[in-house]
Regions:
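Rhodanese-like catalytic fold shared by cysteine-dependent sulfurtransferases
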Residues: 1-49, 53, 61-94, 100-136
């Protein structure tokens, strides 16, 4: 019985550590890097300080209709025309990208980088981390 408990605790601790480490390895944000990984509060501050930011929601249209960040443009990463539509955005302006939980938007960041966007901000944990009091 005690070994079951020990193994269970080890699995939980290992999973928790791996999840955090996976986030850090997959999505490093360093000063001067092409992309910054922001929490909801930091994203809110960014939007206040940079009102010219293009807010890109890469969730499905159904998710977008259920609620979105103020001023967001919805271009679903699941669309076959995603790259074409994103390429029409202004590459000289900052882009704040998000999805529901942070996974799809990470894929979008890669596409944005490949298309030549230089100032990309990403909301870590996505829309689910956005609270009403986080709004600008």
């Amino acid at each position: 019985m005690i070994w079951t408990f020990v193994i269970l605790i080890a699995v939980i601790v290992g999973w928790y550590w791996y999840e955090g480490d996976w986030d850090r390895r997959l999505f490093k944000a360093q000063p001067g890097s092409v992309c910054a990984n922001l929490n909801a509060g930091q994203a809110n501050a960014w939007l206040r300080e940079h009102p010219e930011t293009q807010v890109l929601d890469v969730r499905s249209s159904g998710e977008f209709e259920g609620g979105a960040l103020p001023g967001a443009v919805n271009i679903s990463i699941g669309e076959s025309s995603f790259e074409t539509k994103v390429a029409a955005l202004n590459k000289d302006k900052p882009v704040l990208v998000y999805c529901a939980g942070g996974f799809r938007s990470r894929k979008a960041v890669i596409v944005l980088k490949q298309l030549g966007f230089r100032n990309i901000q990403h909301i870590h944990r996505g829309y689910m981390s956005w609270q009403p009091d986080s709004q600008p």
